[in-house]
């Protein structure tokens, strides 16, 4: 998984206070700028950030695992520093299991949605997405 993410993401230490800790923390920062006549006159700058936390579950994924990761990511999003250049941040929690994932767990993860606007969206927004990966049958649930 690390090899696939290497092209677009930088790997960093996970943020402090995450419990459970992700096995891998990947960050992608993208900046878009519009200039007028030369690069010294910038009309606007926007930042789009993406964060991916990969969790390897040794046994079956449980509802408590999803709830714990959801609460941690909610806290991270709430503490996200934003400025006038921030446009969007997407947080993805990927839980990977060698055991088959129950349909009830997939429904629980699908129901977990979180969106936060900063300053009525004037300083951007942040979204949380869950991905459950079932290695036993080779399927990803989004």
Give residue ranges: language-model regions:
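Histidine- and/or cysteine-centered catalytic micro-motif in compact active-site loops
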Residues: 56-59, 96
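Charged, structured surface patches that assemble and position nucleic-acid processing machinery
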Residues: 109-141
């Amino acid at each position: 998984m690390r090899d696939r993410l290497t092209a677009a993401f930088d790997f960093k230490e996970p943020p402090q206070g995450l419990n459970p800790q992700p096995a891998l923390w990947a960050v992608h920062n993208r900046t878009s700028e519009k200039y007028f006549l030369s690069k010294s006159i910038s009309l606007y700058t926007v930042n789009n950030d993406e964060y991916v936390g990969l969790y390897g579950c040794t046994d079956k994924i449980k509802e408590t695992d999803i709830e714990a990761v959801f609460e941690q990511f909610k806290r991270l999003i709430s503490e996200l520093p934003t400025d006038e250049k921030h446009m969007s941040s997407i947080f993805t929690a990927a839980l990977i299991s060698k055991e088959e994932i129950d349909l009830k767990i997939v429904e629980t993860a699908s129901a977990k949605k979180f969106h936060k606007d900063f300053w009525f969206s004037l300083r951007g927004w942040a979204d949380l997405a869950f991905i459950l990966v079932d290695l036993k049958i080779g399927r990803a649930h989004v």
